[in-house]
Amino acid sequence: MGRKAIGMGVALVGLLALAWLRATPAMAQVTFGSPSDPARVALGVGAFDITPSRHHKDAETAGEFRGEYRFPDTFSVVAPFLGASVTTDGAAYGYFGLGVDINFGPSWVLTPNAAAGVFERGSGTRLGSWWEFRTGAELAYRFADLSRLGVAVHHTSNAGLTKTNPGEQSVLLIYSIPMH
């Protein structure tokens, strides 16, 4: 699947989401932060480097497993988190970051987030540095018990710290469990 196809898919999902929100005005109330939500443990499974570069011989898609501890809103509407991920190629990434919940009604939550941390590539994609940055978002459905099920899309790169900076994209299914 090429970058153009992925971009078109993301645009289509965005258009469908906007059409759905427009069709359901009661759900279109947007609020920032989730102050009543407790801390959560999030577990994810998906794919690492879904668009491997043809210019790097070691770049290939791998399975990814992720675990995060997400603190409740701490700085107004901003919630910190700590996490780690591993891939089937032996890569490991330990990171810390910040996210902001954007609530579309009581159930749908979009969480843009950014993180930074230490990366060990294993035998997989060479990202060019031991220090990597991750940006992305998660769209999740919040259940009555405050657990969430969603999809996360992230881009990880060294932001130009080194000459080699191919970056990678990940897509994961995430389930988060409230700690109450």
Please annotate each region the language model reported.
Residues 63, 166-180:
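Outer-membrane beta-barrel "beta-signal"
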Residues 1-36, 180:
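Cleavable N-terminal export/targeting peptides
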Residues 43-47, 65, 82-86, 100, ...:
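Transmembrane beta-barrel strands of outer-membrane/channel proteins
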Residues 50-63, 84-95, 106, 122-130, ...:
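Solvent-exposed loop/turn segments connecting transmembrane beta-strands
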Residues 41, 73-78, 106-110, 145-151:
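Repeated loop/turn-to-beta-strand initiation elements of outer-membrane beta-barrel proteins
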Residues 28-71:
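Outer-membrane beta-barrel initiation region
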Residues 65-69, 96-98, 137, 173-175:
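Membrane-embedded beta-strands of outer-membrane beta-barrel proteins
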Residues 69-73, 100-102, 141, 155, ...:
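Residue-level signature of outer-membrane beta-barrel architecture
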